[in-house]
Amino acid sequence: MYITEASIDSYSSLYQISAVEVGQHFYWEIGDLRVHGQVLITSWVVIGILLTVAFLGTRKLETVPNATQNFVEYVLQFIRDLARTQIGEEEYRDWVPFVGTLFLFIFVSNWSGALVPWKLIELPHGELAAPTNDINTTVALALLTSGAYFYAGFHKRGLSYFGKYLQPTPVLLPINILEDFTKPLSLSFRLFGNILADELVVAVLVSLVPLVVPIPMMFLGLFTSGIQALIFATLAAAYIGESMEGHH
């Protein structure tokens, strides 16, 4: 049996694919705590981008808006319409900042994973990646969403809010409680899985066919990243609206 050069190349390609990693964490040691440094660094970058755009778009408000102000106003109107549709005309205004923050943070985080070459930035240990590429970030967003609709329901309906857990029968109390936690957690796992899968697919394709095939996949990744941000924010707003209206 002869081993041809082509077969060696094919085995080499397979080895490169098998070497693609999910990610190496970069930790900060603070006392006895280990903090995910790469998540904090990239999150600060995302927050900095959002604050910069907000500052540039609102520092000199004009009757005839410039391009940046026009863009900021369009985004704000989009978020207000989303919150109004899901929460309701009477209650949505108080929740526009929360829903908008969720949507914009997830959207910019997802796009940063597709557009910013984080892996080219060398660190002593580990590597940088989009904030939503870490399960800790998405679970934290899910817990914030859970806290938000618990607060919304209790603030609007008082102690009667907890009566929904006894419907339609008290036997379902544990399941109803579990459901309120699993709904946002399912969002977090979906978001994490989609962003991680997108980065892994691009990494595998780059190892096989550099520059050619990955480009369409990157555009597809940008589209799905935007859709994931919209889904998370829309369902979070829907859960908040449902908690204030009652159990359906």
Swiss-Prot record:
Transmembrane region(s): 37-57, 96-116, 135-155, 200-220, 221-241
GO molecular function, one term: proton-transporting ATP synthase activity, rotational mechanism
One Pfam family hit: ATP-synt_A
Similarity remark: Belongs to the ATPase A chain family.
Main location: plastid
GO cellular component: chloroplast thylakoid membrane; plasma membrane; proton-transporting ATP synthase complex
Assembly behavior: F-type ATPases have 2 components, CF(1) - the catalytic core - and CF(0) - the membrane proton channel. CF(1) has five subunits: alpha(3), beta(3), gamma(1), delta(1), epsilon(1). CF(0) has four main subunits: a, b, b' and c.
CDD domains: ATP-synt_Fo_a_6
Keyword Nucleus: no
Full protein name: ATP synthase subunit a, chloroplastic
Gene: atpI
Membrane topology field: Multi-pass membrane protein
InterPro entries in the cross-refs: ATP_syn_F0_a_bact/chloroplast, ATP_synth_F0_asu, ATP_synth_F0_asu_AS, F0_ATP_A_sf
PANTHER family named among the record's database cross-references: ATP SYNTHASE SUBUNIT A, CHLOROPLASTIC
Species, as recorded: Staurastrum punctulatum
Location relative to the cell: Plastid, Chloroplast thylakoid membrane
Keyword list, A-Z: ATP synthesis, CF(0), Chloroplast, Hydrogen ion transport, Ion transport, Membrane, Plastid, Thylakoid, Transmembrane, Transmembrane helix, Transport
Function: Key component of the proton channel; it plays a direct role in the translocation of protons across the membrane.
HAMAP family, per database record: ATP_synth_a_bact
